[in-house]
């Protein structure tokens, strides 16, 4: 029996060292509490880091072998389930702490790093999505960077919009101090490839080239005694096809609202997601302003540095509907905006998951006669709306008792469905929920943002119920179905 990542996740909830024990059925993980032996060797390790004693090294050797066995098994498992590159990145993130012991905290840190290495988010598998990229801030000597790209491969001519904000002009000794506070002209590069090249210094690139040269010599046995320091690349440092070093970013893939398709061709729809049109307009305008030298860059800024500009794009896409904007005090940083983008992603994914579960339940597991009875007060209007606006995906369930809708759909049809569903929810809910239910009631004339906010409230209300009855599930489903049609501008023909 081989171990899986899930076994390490289960073991990570303990505070003590995690070790491997071999059994006749295969290796198992043993989670222990810290004891005096662990404390003793941790202290020795700390002392030895300063004095580098050969005697202490021997004492620590066997103790560390126990940690290394657990660590190597974890890294091999991680490499097989994800990738060797992500396992390498995970090791880099935790290599200092695992010198003492291999703990649940180390597992969580390395799993999070491995997950971020290839990008997080279910939207990665979709043909339409937003990618937030972050090169993290590691202090004043490495400020980091952010960029945003919007991809749409569903169009006849696919689009890829990119924004990565930089200051114009060169920094000299005379302008170095003012560089932090003064406004300068701003501009955007057009590709992720350019960003990767920009994120590595000439000095680092030279060291990486020198290290590669030494390794090549040693591998060919032409120079066994070369005394140059071998400089190894990190997991996110790679050469491009032209021989230039670059640094990959941490990526967050965020869903866009509306119709979509998976990379294997499966049709999907996101009721919740960022607004592609608004964000694309913002990016195009900002780049046009930069071309006319009307756009600014300011490093110490809430909105005019790279992170602030990325935050502006998310805001244009209505991100604050899903999660409040971060409280930026003085300057927007890549790390803070990355954390915010990830929270937006998590909220959108959670809402879409709940929405899809509600849709799937009613549309696949239902009693036709019972649902027809529950819809009797608004069945005619419901069928008219659905048959006209979704003829290709419409199911027989909705057209029972009303097979020939010839009248035009009116706002009264939308109101009939909304009022009937809302009325049932109010009657079946506790009296203290009336205000909440009134806030989620959609009007056919509501703006797009209002419909999204009310759809979120519908989902949150549904998730707050412990055991909703069939009627509640159906009316929640129908309200969300109406909201979906309204968001698709179905009411523009009313």
Curated annotation (Swiss-Prot):
What family is this protein classified in? Belongs to the BopA/IcsB family.
Q: What is this protein called?
A: N-epsilon-fatty acyltransferase IcsB
- The main place the protein resides is secreted
| Membrane spanning residue stretches | none
Report the gene name. Answer: icsB
Q: What is the effect of changing residue 202 to D?
A: In plasmid pCP301 and plasmid pINV_F6_M1382
Provide the alphabetized UniProt keywords.
Acyltransferase, Plasmid, Secreted, Transferase, Virulence
InterPro entries (alphabetical): Globular_prot_asu/bsu (IPR011070)
- What result follows from mutating residue 2 to I? In plasmid pCP301 and plasmid pINV_F6_M1382
Q: What's the reported outcome of changing residue 482 to V?
A: In plasmid pINV_F6_M1382
GO molecular function ontology, one term from the record = acyltransferase activity
Supply any other comment: The icsB gene can be read-through into the ipgA gene to create a translational fusion protein. The biological significance of this process is unclear.
Query: Tell me, how does this one assemble?
Result: Interacts with its chaperone IpgA.
Q: Region Involved in binding IpgA: start and end of each range?
A: 171-247
Q: What is its EC number?
A: 2.3.1.-
Q: What is the effect of changing residue 285 to Q?
A: In plasmid pINV_F6_M1382
Q: Where in the cell is it found?
A: Secreted; Host vacuole
Mutating residue 336 to N leads to what result?
In plasmid pINV_F6_M1382
Outcome of mutating residue 94 to V: In plasmid pINV_F6_M1382
- Which class of enzymes does this protein belong to? transferase
Protein function: Virulence-associated N-epsilon-fatty acyltransferase that mediates lysine-stearoylation of host Rho GTPase proteins, thereby disrupting the host actin cytoskeleton. Required at the post-invasion stage of Shigella pathogenicity. Contributes to bacterial escape from autophagy.
| Resulting phenotype, residue 116 to A | In plasmid pWR100
């Amino acid at each position: 029996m081989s171990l899986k990542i899930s076994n390490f996740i289960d073991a990570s909830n303990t505070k003590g060292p995690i070790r491997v024990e071999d059994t006749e059925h295969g290796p198992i993980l043993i989670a222990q509490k810290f004891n005096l032996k662990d404390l003793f060797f941790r202290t020795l390790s700390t002392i030895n880091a300063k004095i580098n004693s050969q005697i202490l090294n021997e004492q620590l050797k066997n103790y560390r072998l126990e940690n290394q066995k657990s660590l190597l098994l974890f890294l091999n498992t991680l490499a097989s389930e994800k990738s060797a590159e992500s396992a390498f990145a995970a090791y880099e993130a935790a290599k200092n702490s695992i010198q003492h012991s291999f703990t649940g905290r180390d597992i969580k840190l390395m799993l999070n790093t491995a997950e971020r290495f290839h990008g997080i988010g279910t939207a990665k598998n979709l043909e339409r999505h937003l990618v937030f990229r972050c090169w993290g801030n590691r202090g004043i000597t490495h400020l980091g960077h952010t960029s945003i790209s919007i991809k749409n491969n569903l169009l006849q001519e696919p689009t890829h919009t990119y924004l990565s904000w930089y200051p114009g002009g060169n920094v000299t000794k005379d302008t170095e101090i003012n560089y932090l506070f003064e406004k300068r002209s701003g501009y955007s590069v057009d590709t992720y490839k350019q960003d990767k090249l920009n994120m590595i210094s000439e000095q680092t690139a030279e060291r990486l080239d020198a290290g590669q040269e030494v390794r090549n010599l040693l591998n060919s046995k032409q120079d066994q005694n070369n005394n140059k320091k071998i400089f190894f690349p990190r997991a996110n440092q790679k050469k491009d096809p032209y021989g230039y070093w670059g640094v990959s970013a941490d990526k967050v893939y965020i869903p866009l609202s509306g119709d979509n398709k998976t990379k294997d061709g499966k049709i999907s729809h996101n009721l919740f997601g960022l607004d592609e049109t608004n964000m694309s307009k913002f990016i195009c305008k900002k780049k046009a302003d930069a071309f006319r030298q009307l756009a600014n860059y300011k490093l110490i800024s809430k909105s005019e540095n790279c992170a602030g500009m990325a935050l502006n794009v998310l805001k244009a896409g209505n991100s604050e509907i899903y999660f409040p904007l971060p409280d930026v005090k003085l300057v927007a940083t890549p790390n803070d905006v990355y954390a915010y983008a990830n929270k937006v992603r998590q909220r959108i994914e959670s809402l879409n998951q709940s929405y899809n579960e509600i849709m799937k339940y009613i549309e696949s597991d239902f009693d036709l006669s019972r649902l027809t009875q529950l819809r009797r007060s608004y069945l005619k209007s419901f069928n008219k709306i659905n048959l006209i606006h979704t003829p290709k995906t419409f199911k027989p369930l909705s057209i029972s008792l009303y097979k020939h809708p010839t009248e035009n759909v009116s706002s009264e049809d939308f109101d009939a469905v909304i009022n009937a569903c809302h009325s049932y929810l109010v009657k079946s809910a506790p009296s203290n929920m009336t205000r909440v239910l009134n806030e989620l009631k959609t009007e056919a004339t509501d703006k797009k943002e209002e419909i999204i906010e009310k759809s979120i409230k519908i989902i949150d209300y549904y998730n707050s119920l412990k055991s909703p009855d069939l009627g509640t599930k159906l009316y929640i489903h129908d309200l969300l179905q109406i909201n979906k049609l309204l968001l698709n501008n179905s009411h523009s023909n009313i």
